[in-house]
């Protein structure tokens, strides 16, 4: 319990900080070349018309080329979208194709107990904290969801499946990536994210609670949506130099 208290305290301190915008360009990240992925297996749903844009021609596996401009911290570093598995084995482990009475598939398999990391007693590690005005948060998914995270948190720490990266509408940002500014204080359940979908997790998630979602907070003025590009700032001078730019001269 002492560890849990210390851990939550640390999370609360770091999570409430307003994340400074960073500019992360992934344009140099090459598209996954044909033949570099083993696309065999019964779990793969190959669609020839999608083969140039999605791994193995299957949208569930995410785009073959990552978004070119994504404000998500150390997005590329150490990111292995399949967690060491082949695409077929990844889908076999994390996707349930069983159809229900309505004919719809069960779909992605999500962790129990709201996705929080579990302690030695199998209880979720979480605590109530207040999100203060000016805090930037974001999420991958529609505003009908109940989860948000500190803006710009590394993707691998969110433990999300690769379909969240689909970017056929806008090549710079994933289709369903949303950024919000907290304008009125509200309370959330905060805690570490359980490793899942082959990802390391242990980022911070904010669970809004049962019976309430992001849209509710947008409607009542607690959140205001921003453009994802608002997190990406083009700045010059000391501290903002990129690798492909000339050094800033000290001379007048």
Predicted segments with their positions:
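Fungal secretory targeting signals
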Residues: 1-21, 252
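Generic hydrophobic-segment detector
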Residues: 5-7, 124, 141
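A generic structural signal for short, solvent-exposed coil/turn residues
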Residues: 9-11, 129, 172
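Conserved NAD+-utilizing ADP-ribose enzyme module
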Residues: 18-119, 140-145, 154-252
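Glycine-centered loop/turn motifs
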Residues: 125-135
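Histidine-centered catalytic micro-motifs used for acid/base chemistry in nuclease
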Residues: 150-151
């Amino acid at each position: 319990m002492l560890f849990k208290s210390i851990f939550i305290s640390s999370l609360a301190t770091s999570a409430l900080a307003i994340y400074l915008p960073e500019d992360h360009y992934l344009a140099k990240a090459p598209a996954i070349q044909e033949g570099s992925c083993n696309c065999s297996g019964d779990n793969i749903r190959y669609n020839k018309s999608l083969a140039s844009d999605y791994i193995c021609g299957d949208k569930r596996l995410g785009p073959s080329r990552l978004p070119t401009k994504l404000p998500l911290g150390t997005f590329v570093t150490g990111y292995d979208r399949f967690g060491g598995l082949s695409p077929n084995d990844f889908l076999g482990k994390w996707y349930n194709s069983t159809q229900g009475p309505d004919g719809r598939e069960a779909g992605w398999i999500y962790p129990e107990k709201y996705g929080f990391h579990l302690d030695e007693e199998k209880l979720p590690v979480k605590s109530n904290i207040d999100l203060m005005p000016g805090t930037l948060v974001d999420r991958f998914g529609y505003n009908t969801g109940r989860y948000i995270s500190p803006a710009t948190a590394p993707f691998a720490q969110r433990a999300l499946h690769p379909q969240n990266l689909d970017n056929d509408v806008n090549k710079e940002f994933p289709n369903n990536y949303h950024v919000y500014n907290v304008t009125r204080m509200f309370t959330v359940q905060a805690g570490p994210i359980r490793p899942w979908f082959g990802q390391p997790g242990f980022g911070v998630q904010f669970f809004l609670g049962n019976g309430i979602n992001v849209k509710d907070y947008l409607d009542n003025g607690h959140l205001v949506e921003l453009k994802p590009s608002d997190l990406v700032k083009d700045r010059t001078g000391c501290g903002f130099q990129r690798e492909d730019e000339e050094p800033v001269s000290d001379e007048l």
